[in-house]
Every structure is written in C-alpha cells, then in structure tokens.
Design a protein with these regions (language model features):
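RNA pseudouridine synthases
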Residues: 1-193
Length: 193
C-alpha cells in the first residue's frame, strides 16, 4: 500500500468486480469498504482495477489509487512488461520449458467456456518454466505473455494436462482438490515507477 497503488491478495472463489450474478462480495466491494480513493478510469464497477484473476484463482491484484497510476499500469500490462507468474497443480507429467502457443476464444458450442476451437480466437502464449512431479501430478510454475480469460486452464487442458479439480476444463479428471485453489497467481507484479 503506497500513494499510487495497493496490492491485495484475492482468495479463490472471489470475483474481482461486480457483474451479472455477482453484485456483492467482490474484491471491488471489499476495496471500496476500506479505500474510498481509487482511480476512476475503470468506472463505478471497476474502480482502480487494471487486471483481474479468474474467480477460482487466488493471488495478487494490483489496484491503482489514482488515474496516473492506472494509466501507467495499463500501459505496462498492454506492452507485456508485467511478469505474470502462476503456480498450477496439473494431472500428468509436464516437462519444464514447454511453450503453449494456441489462440483461444469463446467456445462456439458451450458459450460459457473458452476454447482453442473458437473462430474468434486471440493470441495466447503460456510457458511452463519449472515443473516438479509426484505420483501422477505435476506442480508447475507457469508464465503467461498474454492474459486471456481461463488461458492457463484452457492451454493445460488442451495439451492433456488439466488443472487438478478444474470443473470446467478438467475432463475426466474432476477429482476433489487437495487444496482449495490448485491454480495460484500471479506471484510477482511490477509496480509503476
């Protein structure tokens, strides 16, 4: 927490900003309860919000306190200057050093899901930078160059290694999770100068 930004830990299960079906209990609701001065660039539903994490993902969110900080953070995210590192527990053996370069977009059949089969797919790049293996699962450190909705979950499922207990992209691997959040992210964010 400083004059420009506040960094908060978003728990798994919490939605970042209000949307249809999620008006209360969001990260924005909690922020506004504690901090009244946030950047107005995101409007009333997304004040100070520069990036987001999926509902099921826990991790750090950086929030802009004023418009200048918001603009600088948005520029850094747009220019891919922010290092976004995630940790994911997945089924199977995944080799470190793997690059997944598969465009993704809204699934043409199941509209609530994201897929590699979308006609309006956008560039999405995921890299597995570290992997540890134990009894049929891999604990991965993953970096994303892009930040598409469900990107890591879709990419890992597309290569046959879904995130453990993922109800949407886990396929036959929908076992109960060993921990409430098998996907955690990001562990490092670059704050504005």
């Amino acid at each position: 927490n400083d004059a420009d930004v506040v960094v908060v830990e978003k728990p798994a299960g919490m939605v970042v900003h209000p949307a249809t079906g999620h008006r209360q209990g969001t990260l924005v609701n909690a922020l506004l309860h504690h901090i009244t001065d946030l950047s107005g660039i995101g409007g009333t539903l997304r004040p100070g919000i520069v990036h987001r994490l999926d509902r099921g993902t826990s991790g750090l969110i950086i929030v802009a306190k004023h418009d200048q900080a918001h603009a600088e953070l948005a520029r850094q995210f747009k220019n891919r200057e922010v290092e976004k590192t995630y940790i994911a527990l997945v089924w199977g053996f995944v080799q470190a050093g793997r690059r997944i370069d598969l465009p993704i977009g809204r699934d043409p059949v199941q509209r609530k899901k994201i897929s590699t089969r979308s006609r309006r797919a956008r560039e999405a790049i995921t890299r597995v930078v570290k992997a540890e293996h134990l009894r049929g699962v891999s604990l991965l450190r993953v970096m994303i160059a892009t930040g598409r909705t469900h990107q890591i979950r879709v990419h890992l499922s597309a290569i046959g290694h879904p995130v453990v207990a993922d109800p949407n992209y886990g396929g036959k691997h929908r076992h109960p999770p060993p921990h409430p959040a098998p996907l955690r992210a990001p562990s490092r964010l670059q704050p504005p100068p």
